Amino acid sequence: MVGTTKYVALVGGGKQPKFPQNKVSPEDTDWVFADADTHKVQIWNDEKEVVSTSLEFKTSVQRVRISQKYLIVVLLNNVGIYKLKIPPEKVADYETVNNPFGLCSLGDKIVAFPGRMIGQVRLYNTATGNNSIITAHEAPLQAIALSPKEDMVATASEKGTLVRLWSFPSCTKIAEFRRGVDPATIFSLAFSPFATMLAVTSDKSTLHIFDLPNPGTTSTDPDPNNHKWGFLSKMPLLPRQFSDTYASASTKFELGDEPGAAATSKSATHHAAISGVPGGRPTKGLIGWLDDHTIVIVGAGQDARWEKFVVGNANGKRFVGKEGWKKYLE
């Protein structure tokens, strides 16, 4: 949705997409089955219930990001950047590595998406046209997030054990967080409104909260008194898992009774299993911050639900707890 306006970007998807992907004129308002050979992004005027404009592509649209100024269309191996007007005006076009999850984060001026090499993040400045590259991981990317002020970028790879924090525009690493030791699929990364915390969800059905450093600082060693492993974090020759920075607080969220929801080992180097669905699976663990102390996690699919969590401090330590939930399709 374009802010709080009447315009919505729609893409047909799933096994039987009902929003038209074939030829649509502005006066068409009927729901029809899609033409599998044509792939479109529709800009829908919800007030007049008409398609205001559309873009057509030869391959499936993995994801769309939209603001009041720009429309970003993510294909499997390409990202197109358009000025939002009728018709949309293309201003940039970039090849990417395979991107079946449609990874893309859009800020006010910065667009972050995978580069042409595995593990790379490209940051495009819509105001200047300048590009920056971060070599973030050795493995394919699984998640990307921009901070509200666009001065930090969070990344995770398909290994899912580490989350890295980068300063922008310097593109230097300022922190590295350990989600866990076992591999996992990261579902979502999201900065709090004031960028003091980073929330992370994974297919381990866990929500992690990490406290963030100032983007102008460099990495510092954590206080052993507040570290998960205490004084062991300072012992030499121990595996790095003992010295890494862990979440300040964690709690469980519900994946729901979704067939195959936890079986998300699909590599980002392969195509999605279900046409029209990024990553080939229903969205799970999508994070949204309502304010600096309240999180909502949304899951789609057959067992679609939202859960509300509150983040706070008690006895000098961070905590996160569930406040409510609802199955929103019932």
What is the predicted role of each segment?
Residues 42-50, 81-95, 114-141, 158-175, ...:
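Per-blade loop-tip surfaces of WD-repeat and WD-like beta-propellers in eukaryotic adaptors/scaffolds
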